[in-house]
Amino acid sequence: MKLTQLILEKRNKPKLVVMAGGSGTGKSYLLNQLDLGSLHQVNPDKYVEDPNSPAYNKLSPGVALANKEAEALADDKTSFVWDTTASNPDKIKLFLNKGYDVYMVMVYTHPVIAYLSNAKRKRQIPATAVFSTWRNVYDLIDKYNKMLKGNLSIFVNTRGGEFDKYVKEFNTAAKNGAAGISDYLENLNKKEKIGGSSFRDPYKMSDQEEQEFYNAVKNIDYDVNDYSEDRALKKYFTDWYRKKGEGPGDDKMKQRLASHRSGKERDQVRHKQALDDIADMLFDPLFQAKLLHSTPAEIDKKVQKFLS
């Protein structure tokens, strides 16, 4: 194959710019400083914030619809910008396999800045998701750099020092691993009156279903004030009731409760591991050395060259 043909094929390849990073890192802030307005933009927020969307105020369905939109664009070989956590490298590899040139702009911020920024947003994801995503994304820096053959820029977002006090406190707590971080966050939540998630909607039941449910749980020892426990039982009961016209009975309800609690315990173990990993990463000089900051102007220059 002639060199000119190779050059033409490369120029005709569709381009994907990935804005990577977890919730509260400032991806939108950086994107607004890059000259990418001519490219189609894929963002789960479009679906989550639209009252007419089936994913309105539902994070996971919003992400699923955004992923579906991105895959449809790939089928048409359309160049676009994708706002995503990038916590799953297989999804990025999918576009490489479809013939895309990919450039990743990874927005990094300290975990407590991400946590506090998320808490100030109108739409807040659970704290466990903030920290697990933080760990998962930034643990992939080397992998992405290799996969994309150096087409990776990192923007270290310090928010102008606004959160320096909290960064120092968090780092001190992190010296005691997950336990230290958990204690710090508990106190921080009380002090700042934050925590929780805006995606926690009450489970919708008809009046009759609700009456039948409360009759069915009279002998079930569960925590009605525990959102996830209450929702899990209501969903299980309602699905069964709508299908069979009656409740599942005490034994099955108790089994569902036990299953939910076991899953919650596993989630707590995973969350503790994520916090331990974060503590290790913060004090790991090899990890810190990977955070090679580029300014918005420097990133834009590299991205424009990539797109040309």
Regions flagged by a language model, labelled:
Residues 62-100:
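Glycine-rich phosphate-binding loop used to anchor ATP phosphates in small-molecule kinases
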Residues 26:
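Conserved glycine(s) of the Walker
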Residues 29-78:
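Conserved substrate/cofactor phosphate-moiety recognition/catalytic segment
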Residues 116-224, 282, 286:
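Conserved GTP-binding G-domain of TRAFAC-class P-loop NTPases and closely related GTPase folds
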Residues 100-115:
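Conserved phosphate-donor/acceptor-positioning beta-strand/loop module used by diverse small-molecule
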Residues 10-13, 73:
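Phosphate-binding P-loop
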Residues 22-23:
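The conserved Walker
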